[in-house]
Amino acid sequence: MTNFRWTVVAMLFAATTVNYLDRQVLSLTWDEFIKPEFHWNESHYGTITSFFSIFYAISMLFAGRFVEWMGTKKGYLWSIGVWSVGACLHAVCGVATEAYVGLGSAAELAAATGDVAVVIATVSMWSFLVARGVLALGEAGNFPAAIKATAEYFPKKDRAYATSIFNAGASIGALFAPLTIPPLAKYFGWEMAFLIIGVLGFIWMGFWVFLYDDPKKSKHVNKAELEYIEQDKHELTEEENKKVAEKVSLNKCFSFKQTWAFVAGKFMTDGVWWFFLFWTPSYLNTQFNIKTSEGLGMALIFTLYLIVTVLSIYGGKLPTLIINKSGLNPYAARMRSMLIFAFFPLLVLLAQPLGMHFDYLGRNAAWIPVILISIGCAAHQAWSANLFSTIGDMLPQGAIATVTGIGGMAGGIGSMLLQKGAGNLFHYAGETNMTFMGFEGKPAGYFIIFCICAFAYLIGWAIMKSLVPKYKVVTL
């Protein structure tokens, strides 16, 4: 039997890695390189990250339908092509700002004061908003296309594991980002960091064009592998298989409780991942005076996502082990696994207290919150892989990309609320020196957000379980 399905997973993994590398460039360059040049504060950055989240959310709704309409191969090509253009557009934001305000260099922008500095901050922020919008529009297609490709190439029992592997690309992207992006920005300028990382997407497109095809048409898939891929179809009649493959309307997708359960899971938890992805570098700088361009900063971020990568892949394997051992249906096994994963983010509650308690360690005290955050993030990725797989468990194949898009929109909205709220809270906390649970200033703001992140998964699981308490396949 051929094993081309794992080559497909490798390509999905590579695309997701590039996806997250492109997103990470801003979070790893704004505080040290972009902020001084454009006179930004946390509110400006919070506006940009929240806009990305909401535009990504809106785009997800249409990206799912677009992938269903175009098909997996063409839909993915368009998606990564657009987001690669968006990634490269960030590099011209500085030039655009210089042209608008009539200054000739980055040094002149950074040296500006008064009203001119305010104009620079505003114009540059809007330039980045445009670039982030194009990036979000393209990146919205990644998960609908990847989940659809997984459903095309894997039987139900293997989908969570396959999803956990390509979903680990998010962690790998975040893992290599601090090792590559800050040095690129430091030695070649932050603009080149955006350009070089953006070009990777165009390289991936060349492989996808020549390698991917529907498994029935693929010259790389033999009869034995095709039978393995389509083993679930033997459980249905020929007429039922035809209905499963039919495209399902957007309105019809909204009528399924299974859709709303997925929406609830995404809304409650996606923002947690984005918060740690976007704000951890800034948190380390604010709390411990550690910059991502220095050795300790790179080591901390690298370790965080190394732990996430290793642990999250095993999280995708857990439902398969439960199914094989107990004979539970896929949905029940996933929900049991997700409940286990939902308890691990509670460790994030200890990040701030322990980080402050061991302050005698100096900047090395940062290792404590980083390790706790990494465990919470690993639990998120394991949770996410299983959450995505619930779609294929209960919904027809013709609805998978659409429902993935709907859930992605919900996750983006939840993320936008958390990112914007966090940015405003941190700015307010710093300005007013607010106190909360023994913390003062920005540390108080971080502790509030950490509390929200810690409980999000248990709340999300409870809502999902109440909407779909038992395994029920949608019939058309």
Indicate residue ranges for each PLM-predicted region.
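Extracytoplasmic
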Residues: 7-42, 97, 276-281
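Residue-level signature of mid-helix packing/kink "hotspots" within the transmembrane helices
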Residues: 24, 53-61, 140, 174-175, ...
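Extracytoplasmic gate region of multi-pass secondary transporters
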Residues: 26-28, 254-313, 353, 380-384, ...
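Primarily marks hydrophobic transmembrane alpha-helices of the MFS/SLC 12-helix fold
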Residues: 76, 128, 335-338
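C-terminal ends and interior cores of transmembrane alpha-helices
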Residues: 81-121, 339-362
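Cytoplasmic helix-loop-helix junction between adjacent transmembrane helices
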Residues: 127, 131-171
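Helix-loop-helix hairpin linking two adjacent transmembrane segments in secondary transporters
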Residues: 170-219
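Multi-pass alpha-helical transporter architecture, strongest
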Residues: 204-212, 348-356, 446-476
